[in-house]
Amino acid sequence: MAIEGEKKKDPRAWDALTPSLAEWVLDAISSMGFEKMTPVQASTIPLFMGNKDVVVEAVTGSGKTLSFLIPVVEKLLRLEEPLKKHHVGAIIVSPTRELATQIHSVLTSLLKFHEPSAEALQPLEEGEKRKPSSTLRVIPQLLLGGTTTPAQDLSRFLKNSPNLLISTPGRLLELLSSPHVHCPQSSFEVLVLDEADRLLDLGFKDDLQKILGRLPKQRRTGLFSASVSEAVGEIVRVGLRNPVKIAVKVKGAGGGDKMTPASLQMSYLLTPPTHKFPALLSLLSQLEPTPQKSIIYLSTCAAVDYFQPLLEAVLPKQFGLVSLHGKHPPNVRQRNFSKYVAAVSPTILLTTDVAARGLDIPQVDLVVQIDPPSDPKVFLHRCGRAGRAGRKGLSVIFLQPGREEDYIPFLEIRKTPITPLKRPEISTTGEAAKILISKMRKEVLSDRALYDKGQRAFVSWVQAYSKHQASSIFRVADLDWTDLGNAWALVRLPKMPELKKWEGDKTLGIKLDMSEYAYKDKIREKARRVAMEEAKNAGPYVPTEEQIAKKKQREAWSQKHEKQDLKELKREKKKRKREIERLEKMTDEEKKEEQAKEKELQDLIEQVKKRKIEDDADVEFEGFAD
């Protein structure tokens, strides 16, 4: 019986865990500012520490990283004796370099509070090797493809003898293939697969199976995933032993499941293309307090490269801007990402879907989607970069008035409701839009290199728009080309198939002598002028024999297909004629039976379609990766 007046311990208090955490872990968590466990931490940590395999499904910002790092560290520090040299005790597998780097960063922040491990984190001198120690400690090694070579990774492994590896699948597999790296049953304790669904989406299934094959079956395994799809289920069956499934849901206002944390507000703003960037600037300047970390999403890598210098020219001075996309070299991606994370003043990350999942960037206050993603599943993961770990966050998507408004009920069906943005109240005028476009266009006119980037970026954007999975909502045929061209601060619309039949002004009313439009780079400009002079003196164009032969080949191929199309048309006409003759010979009773069968078939098709839509709604959006 409880003593009267005795306070009941909060089940989400860190010191309420059983088995209890080490004092230094509690100190580390307190210094990180985490007063209480999140529901996923309270559910996962005791089970994972208590020798259970776990499959964890939870929304974004739910604290999954600490849910596996704390049990992994505790397991390694509760061994009876230190592991032998070059023996690995734990492995954490991540789908991307950025996420692996994040996990390693959180781990090192944790280990700074454990004195023996903190000492082991200090870099060794040239030629020095890690001395064996009788004290238990955690020595991590981060393995990333594209930043170091496999030989350098192995050399570092042999020098430091780490007992915990954090890696992307390919680089991990290369290291495990070395005869100098040992993961025997006597040493290996735990495997963590973070973002398991993302690992499989990126095609790492074969690598994962090979990794599992190199590890002892008697081990603890934790699988952390946004959704447990059939493919993830297969990994569960092969790699886990009687796992406990933990699914943490968030309830919406109507009592149904929501795919986002309660601290995240997801809104939309209806705005024509030319008003998108004025609306963005208005949002950044009106939000109170000023967002410290913001993420702006664009559709393509080329668009990020084009808009970065334009936004730098028009953004308020207090905001820094960093770009990140999948076509950046690995060292540039890593440098830019680190710069963004470490920024102490308000900073914006201009990016593509490379930053839509897995990145646990602290203090992201605002996410703005200038372009809706081609894949509706990604919408959730973009939003989920804000509002993490209970912190308030705002996500805003810009939609064009008209057909794009259908995206709102489309998301509602998928349990992802978005509401109109009411605070701050954003209103933009045509005059403000003209002034901003003029400033951006001034940048474009200052360097022909930006003109080239704009042409490529606009074409890539149109291609991305045309491939949207919600193709009935996002239709190229509905686009206002003049408004779009001005919104992009273009000085010419590019040549592309979509504009062949368009009769508008492709110069957008800009008078420009293209022959005098120069590159800032003197070498490029000199090369352009030389090429221009050569073309002027070259005389009339005469095709080569090879070009003539290719043209004939294309014409022959085209004629062949025309004949095939004609035959197909004749067959279709004959088929329709036979069907009409068959129906004419039928009695009224037979016709009624035929119509009944046709209706039954149509009903069946509709049922299947409806079931597929419902299944898609359940499967596509089952939460976020952390």
From Swiss-Prot:
One Pfam short name: CTE_SPB4
Positions of short motif DEAD box: 194-197
UniProt key word Coiled coil: yes
Feature: compositional bias, Basic and acidic residues: 554-571, 578-599
Coiled coil: 558-620
Principal location class: nucleus
Enzyme Commission code: 3.6.4.13
Gene Ontology biological-process annotations: assembly of large subunit precursor of preribosome; maturation of LSU-rRNA
Gene3D superfamilies according to UniProt: P-loop containing nucleotide triphosphate hydrolases (3.40.50.300)
Binding of ATP, residues: A58, V59, T60, G61, S62, G63, K64, T65
Cellular component annotations (GO), alphabetically ordered: 90S preribosome; nucleolus; nucleoplasm; preribosome, large subunit precursor
Domain Helicase C-terminal: 279-437
Alphabetical list of CDD domains matching this protein: DEADc_DDX55, SF2_C_DEAD
Assigned keywords, A-Z: ATP-binding, Coiled coil, Helicase, Hydrolase, Nucleotide-binding, Nucleus, Ribosome biogenesis, RNA-binding, rRNA processing
GO molecular function (one): RNA binding
Protein location: Nucleus, Nucleolus
Catalytic activity: ATP + H2O = ADP + phosphate + H(+)
Helicase ATP-binding domain location: 45-246
PROSITE patterns referenced in this protein's UniProt entry, alphabetically: DEAD_ATP_HELICASE, HELICASE_ATP_BIND_1, HELICASE_CTER, Q_MOTIF
Motif (Q motif): 14-42
Oligomeric form and interacting partners: Component of pre-60S ribosomal complexes.
Biological function: ATP-binding RNA helicase involved in the biogenesis of 60S ribosomal subunits. Binds 90S pre-ribosomal particles and dissociates from pre-60S ribosomal particles after processing of 27SB pre-rRNA. Required for the normal formation of 18S rRNA through the processing of pre-rRNAs at sites A0, A1 and A2, and the normal formation of 25S and 5.8S rRNAs through the processing of pre-rRNAs at sites C1 and C2.
Recorded domain comment: The Q motif is unique to and characteristic of the DEAD box family of RNA helicases and controls ATP binding and hydrolysis.
Protein name listed in UniProt: ATP-dependent rRNA helicase spb4
Source species: Botryotinia fuckeliana (strain B05.10) (Noble rot fungus)
Primary gene name: spb4
